[in-house]
Every structure is written in structure tokens, then in C-alpha cells.
């Protein structure tokens, strides 16, 4: 069990230090961190202190679609920010339910006012792009680290650059 009081030191840093912060938490800490942020009105506190808060939420296709849609819905309903960036990850399948795309779903329609933007990670060839991304992720490398690494072939780097350009262009559209 995660002691949510430990998030206090994170909040201290977010409030006292300058710069851009990215809090990348995994599935095991998602619920405790969400509870902490909501119960303590932490997002409101950060905004009152002049901090811009963006929450990135992943919705993934395939078997986890309904669970990740439920997570998005809960997050949107429980937070006061209108700066949610939804990442639609098609790696495990299309983001589609009962013949409807994400932006046609009731869950999205009811919470669209909370969404700052949507970034789509398109399903690509799993033998090339998929393996390159898996390798990058397993090594916990950034796009720049892969591109500068001698461990990746020229074509693997080209595929990584293609994905990077696509994602960065979509992030530019979100307008941070």
C-alpha cells in the first residue's frame, strides 16, 4: 500500500521550485495519486499558485479499452482542470466501442469541456515500428537518446523519428 502522505514532498517541490515538472506515474500509483490530488484539492492549489497543470490520460485499445475509458471518465469528473490531454494508444487495438470512435462516445461527449487536446498514437507495423518502440521503452530511452545511439540501426532511428515528428506535431496542436 502506498502512503499517500509521501506525496506531500512532491507538492512541496512543485510549489517551491521553478521549471517544468512531469510526474509520470504507473498503474500501481495511479489510484493513490489521484485520490491524493482530489482529496487535498492539490490541482486547485497549484493553479492558485500560478502553476499550469496538465493531466495526461491514456486510453488504450483492445482488452483494456473499457478500463482506460473508465479511468478517463473518473479523472475528468473528479478534477476541476480543463487541461486534460487524452492519449489514444492504438497499439493493442482500435479505440472504438459499439462502432463509435472515441470522440463519438458518450464518455467523451460528457467530458469534452475538460479535454485540452487529443494525441493519437497510431497502430503501426508491429514488426518494425512496434519492435523499435518496445526496445526504446524497455531501455527507458527518450526519442533523442535513441536517435543518438549506436545501438539502433539507421532505419530503426528513421522509424523513431517518424513517430517523434507525429507525436510532437500533435502536442504542438494542443498548445501548452
Model-derived segments and spans:
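Exposed alpha-helical structural elements
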Residues: 6-9, 32, 41-42, 100-104, ...
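Conserved catalytic-core segment of NTP-binding enzymes
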Residues: 29-131
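NTP-binding/hydrolysis catalytic cores, primarily Walker-type P-loop NTPases
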Residues: 134-176
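Generic structural signal for hydrophobic core residues of well-folded globular domains
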Residues: 14, 59, 171-174
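Nucleotide-state-sensitive switch-loop elements of NTP-binding domains
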Residues: 1-30
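Active-site regions of enzymes building and remodeling cell-envelope glycoconjugates
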Residues: 1, 114-118, 140-142
Amino acid at each position: 500500500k502506498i502512503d499517500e502522505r509521501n506525496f506531500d514532498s512532491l507538492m512541496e517541490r512543485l510549489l517551491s521550485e521553478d521549471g517544468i515538472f512531469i510526474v509520470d506515474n504507473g498503474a500501481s500509483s495511479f489510484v493513490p495519486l489521484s485520490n491524493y490530488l482530489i482529496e487535498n484539492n492539490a490541482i486547485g492549489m497549484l493553479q492558485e499558485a500560478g502553476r499550469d497543470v496538465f493531466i495526461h490520460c491514456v486510453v488504450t485499445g483492445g482488452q483494456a479499452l473499457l478500463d482506460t475509458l473508465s479511468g478517463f471518465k473518473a479523472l475528468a469528473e473528479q478534477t476541476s482542470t480543463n487541461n486534460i490531454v487524452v492519449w489514444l494508444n492504438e497499439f493493442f487495438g482500435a479505440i472504438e466501442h459499439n462502432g463509435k470512435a472515441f470522440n463519438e462516445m458518450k464518455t467523451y461527449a460528457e467530458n469534452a469541456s475538460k479535454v485540452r487536446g487529443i494525441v493519437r498514437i497510431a497502430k503501426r507495423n508491429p514488426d518494425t515500428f512496434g519492435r523499435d518502440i518496445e526496445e526504446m521503452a524497455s531501455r527507458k530511452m527518450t526519442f533523442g537518446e535513441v536517435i543518438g545511439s549506436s545501438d539502433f540501426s539507421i532505419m530503426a532511428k528513421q522509424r523513431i523519428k517518424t513517430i517523434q515528428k507525429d507525436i510532437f506535431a500533435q502536442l504542438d496542436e494542443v498548445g501548452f
